[in-house]
């Protein structure tokens, strides 16, 4: 395998290819009827020039999506985000759910011809553990370190071993269905697990890599799945989103994956040369509310008054122009774990309602107004105006969060709440959140692959910036990792269904998530606003996936034709 060579003419050859292709392929009138998929594709990647190609340390969104064509995992997600088999043919649980036994496919080969075994999976997990412990910076650990955790954060898995060539045992401290999500990491060959550009098992293999220019892939003719129709893919590197967008407009690339606000103009385009697909991310934009004792947002009525005053629809249309998905929960709609929120036990219903906001503020005693129209009340220290600190942190190359903060300031002013808006760098903003020195904070959570909100809702969770405390919620979160009740399962039922315990664990996981969603809605510790989306711009339809997800943006391209 060749990894690095000088290939400065790659982009020029690609442009000539597209020019010839444009003369040969007929133009069509609808975005859903664009030209037939060619056997060669060019993908744009925005990434640093010196990026290394190790799949376990890569964190660049575009690069991870491209490497997803080279490397595969034991488990992947379907369109409902349920775990399904990939390199693992099947699995089962033993020891009351604390031992997971994965059966590896016996017909899978690495790109260098060596057969995949369970010992390769074990070696890959060993590397992940070493990465998790070696670096203090999360961005140096890769995307998968929470699988095993470190001294500060508990991992999902305790230990693992290969018991034969095609059997991997994974051991946990407690029964937990989330283990399946944790097993979604790229599998490497034991002999080359620490090497840069190690061979994978995926539908494409790396032909060569010129840092800062081109990552060239060619189809894996010995793939265990269907032989890829698109025989070669060149991923061309760009320094900025604007540079990549310009390349797309110049027809130098066929596919561009981007979260840049500049790509908004392409959304919904009906063209004979362009398709645009929205893709989902794991970034949840929130308005953090300080639940600390003594905070003005400690009272549930105050938090709900603020929530009722915010018009999410207006934020989405005026600021984000539709490149987000509105939510009231911390779980995405359309997934198997999603549960809709109805009317709560006290009659409250999520949604924009300024009349309800005004009524709640009146109940709290903020029923007077100063000469500027802001709410106030008389205290022993005199008249006090209702003033809240609204903070946000900047996102590189993106002013949308600033615009959203100013819109929220206007919305709160409409119900008489005065706010002072302050901007911080990401580092300083994170320090403010951790210290609790804020009233309102416009920020974002990046959720892990494993759907588990313990980190942000448990009383001592490392991401519990709202300083939320609830014994009920803590019990629900702990129950998420407990074994299901098995007393009601008869011996006959156990014999007839060997996977009975796994089914119980799956059903309990969903039920527990529903209870967590309900409790979160009742307590309203912070306000989920929307999930960030991105856009895939393409000149050819390339995917049959309904749920196109960040980090997996090229999934199924090998089978599309």
Where are these regions (language model features)?
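Short, well-ordered beta-strand elements
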Residues: 38-47, 99-102, 121-124, 168-170, ...
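N-terminal lobe/hinge region of extracytoplasmic solute-binding protein
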Residues: 44-95, 199
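Extracellular/periplasmic solute-recognition and catalytic clefts
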Residues: 47, 135, 207-218, 234-294, ...
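A bilobed periplasmic-binding-protein/Venus flytrap-type ligand-binding module shared by bacterial periplasmic
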Residues: 107, 218-223, 279-305, 309, ...
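Detector for C-terminal structural segments
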Residues: 309-343, 400-409, 433-561
């Amino acid at each position: 395998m060749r990894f690095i060579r000088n290939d400065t003419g790659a982009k020029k050859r690609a442009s000539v290819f597209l020019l010839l292709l444009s003369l040969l392929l007929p133009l069509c009138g609808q975005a859903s009827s664009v030209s037939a998929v060619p056997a060669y594709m060019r993908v744009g990647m925005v990434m640093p020039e010196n990026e290394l190609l190790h799949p376990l340390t890569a964190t660049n969104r575009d690069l991870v999506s491209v490497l997803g064509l080279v490397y595969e995992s034991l488990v992947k997600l379907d369109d409902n985000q349920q775990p399904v088999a990939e390199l693992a043919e099947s699995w089962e649980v033993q020891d009351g759910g604390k031992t997971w036994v994965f059966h590896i496919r016996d017909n899978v080969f690495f790109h260098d011809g060596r057969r995949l075994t369970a010992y390769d999976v074990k070696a890959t997990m060993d590397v992940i553990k070493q990465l998790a412990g070696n670096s203090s910076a999360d961005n140096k650990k890769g995307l998968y370190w929470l699988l095993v955790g470190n001294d500060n954060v508990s991992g999902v898995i305790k230990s693992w071993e290969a018991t034969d060539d095609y059997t991997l045992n994974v051991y946990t401290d407690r029964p937990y269905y989330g283990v399946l999500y944790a097993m979604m990491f790229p599998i490497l060959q034991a002999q080359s697990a620490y090497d840069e550009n190690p061979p994978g098992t995926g539908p494409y293999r790396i032909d060569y890599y010129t840092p800062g220019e081109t990552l060239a892939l060619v189809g894996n003719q010995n793939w265990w799945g269907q032989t890829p129709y698109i025989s070669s893919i060149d991923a061309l590197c760009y320094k900025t989103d604007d540079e990549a967008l310009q390349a797309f407009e110049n027809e130098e690339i066929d596919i561009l994956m981007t979260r840049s606000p500049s790509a908004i103009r392409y959304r919904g385009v009906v063209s004979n040369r362009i398709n645009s697909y929205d893709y989902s991310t794991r970034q949840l934009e929130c308005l953090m509310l300080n639940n600390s004792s003594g905070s003005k947002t400690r009272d549930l009525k105050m938090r709900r008054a603020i929530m009722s005053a915010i018009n999410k629809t207006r934020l989405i249309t005026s600021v984000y122009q539709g490149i987000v998905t509105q939510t009231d929960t911390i779980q995405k709609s359309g997934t198997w774990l999603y549960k809709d929120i109805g009317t709560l036990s006290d009659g409250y219903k999520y949604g924009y309602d300024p009349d309800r906001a005004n009524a709640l503020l009146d109940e709290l005693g903020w029923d007077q107004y100063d000469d500027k129209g802001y709410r106030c009340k008389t205290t022993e220290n005199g008249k006090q105006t209702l003033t809240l600190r609204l903070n946000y942190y900047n996102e590189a190359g993106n002013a949308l969060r600033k615009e959203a903060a100013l819109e929220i300031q206007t919305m709160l002013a409409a119900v008489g709440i005065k706010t002072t808006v302050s901007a911080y760098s990401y580092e300083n903003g994170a320090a403010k959140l951790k210290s609790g020195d804020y009233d309102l904070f416009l920020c974002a959570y990046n959720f892990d692959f494993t759907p588990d909100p313990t980190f942000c809702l448990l009383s001592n969770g490392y991401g519990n910036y709202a300083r939320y405390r609830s014994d009920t919620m803590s019990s629900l979160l702990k129950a998420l990792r407990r074994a299901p009740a098995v007393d009601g399962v008869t011996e006959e039922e156990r014999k007839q269904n060997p996977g009975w315990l796994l089914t119980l664990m799956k059903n309990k996981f969903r039920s527990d998530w529903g209870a967590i969603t309900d409790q979160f809605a009742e307590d309203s510790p912070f306000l989920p606003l929307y999930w960030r989306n991105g856009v895939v711009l393409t000149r050819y339809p390339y995917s049959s996936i309904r749920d196109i997800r960040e980090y997996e943006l090229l999934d199924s391209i090998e089978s599309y034709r």
